[in-house]
Amino acid sequence: MAKSSTKRRPAPEKPVKTRKCVFCSKKGKNQDIDYKDTQLLRTYISERGKIRARRVTGNCVQHQRDIAIAVKNAREVALLPFSSSTR
């Protein structure tokens, strides 16, 4: 059995839209990541209670680590839920 000699075209490349880190930008310079600031931390948590990925949020490596640590501390102190209450 010989393979058919039809060649596939490569898919057109989609332009990659890079997001800037909010905390590194000028308007976020004076904003600190604190585990007690649940309103800020909720923006980085999915509906299921998981911490959103860095490629989704657009944060830099250092600030994504700080967000993860703050979320984990807030969960420990019961300021944020460990998981979503809906099933």
UniProtKB/Swiss-Prot annotation:
Alphabetical GO biological process terms: translation
An example molecular function term from Gene Ontology annotations: small ribosomal subunit rRNA binding
Keywords attached to this entry: Ribonucleoprotein, Ribosomal protein, RNA-binding, rRNA-binding
SUPFAM superfamilies: Ribosomal protein S18
Organism domain of life: Bacteria
A cellular-component GO term for this protein: cytosolic small ribosomal subunit
Pfam families: Ribosomal_S18
Function: Binds as a heterodimer with protein bS6 to the central domain of the 16S rRNA, where it helps stabilize the platform of the 30S subunit.
Entry similarity comment: Belongs to the bacterial ribosomal protein bS18 family.
Subunit structure: Part of the 30S ribosomal subunit. Forms a tight heterodimer with protein bS6.
Protein name: Small ribosomal subunit protein bS18B
Name of encoding gene: rpsR2
